[in-house]
Amino acid sequence: RQAVEGCTGGPILGYRAPRWSLGGAPGGGRRGRASGVVGPALDVLVREGFRYDSSLAPIVHIGDPDWPRDPYRIDRPGGSIVELPPLVGRRFGVPLLFAGGWALRRVPNRVLLRAIEARNPAGAPAVIDVHTWEFDPDPPRVRLPFMYRLAHYGGLRGYRAKLEELLRS
C-alpha cells in the first residue's frame, strides 16, 4: 500500500482482494469458499483506514448470490466500510461476474452495456476492474491447464479497443 501511495502521491482508500479470495459471508457466515474469513479481513481493512472494499462478489462460485448487488455499508466492531460489489450480469440465464478478467474481455459490449444501463436508473455504479497486464496483446505465456489458459489469455487481442469502445458508450 505504501509503495503505491508513494507512486501516486495520494492515499489508497479502497481494497480488492486478489482472485475474489475473501468469499464467505459479510458477517463471517458459512456460504462461499472462504467462510469465516470475511469478518476478520474487513476488521483489518477498517483498522488500516480503508473506506471501501470491492472483494465480495454476489455470485455462487466466488461469493454468495444473496449478497447485495448495490453498494452497502458493513458495520464492524472497529467501524464501518462500504462494500462496492462488482458488476454482475446474466448470460444465457446464468448470473455471471462481468466486472473484469475473462468476462469483461469476452462478453460482447452490447451485453455489458445492458447490464450497466440496468443499474443507471437507481444511480448504482457498475464496478469493473481492469488489470494492467491485459493491455499487452501478447504477454509472456506460461504453461497452464486448458481452462486456466482460456481464462487468463482469452480475449486479450483487441481488448484495449473493446474497453475504449465500452467507455465511449
What is the role of each PLM region?
Residues 2, 42, 164:
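Short glycine-/small-residue-rich flexible loop motifs, especially phosphate/cofactor-binding loops
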Residues 11-14, 141:
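Bulky hydrophobic/aromatic packing residues
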Residues 5, 83, 134:
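Acidic-residue sensor for enzyme active/binding pockets
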Residues 106-169:
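C-terminal domain-boundary segment and adjacent tail
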Residues 1-7:
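An active-site-proximal structural segment forming one wall of the substrate-binding cleft
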Residues 10, 17-129:
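Active-site-adjacent pocket scaffolds in enzyme catalytic domains
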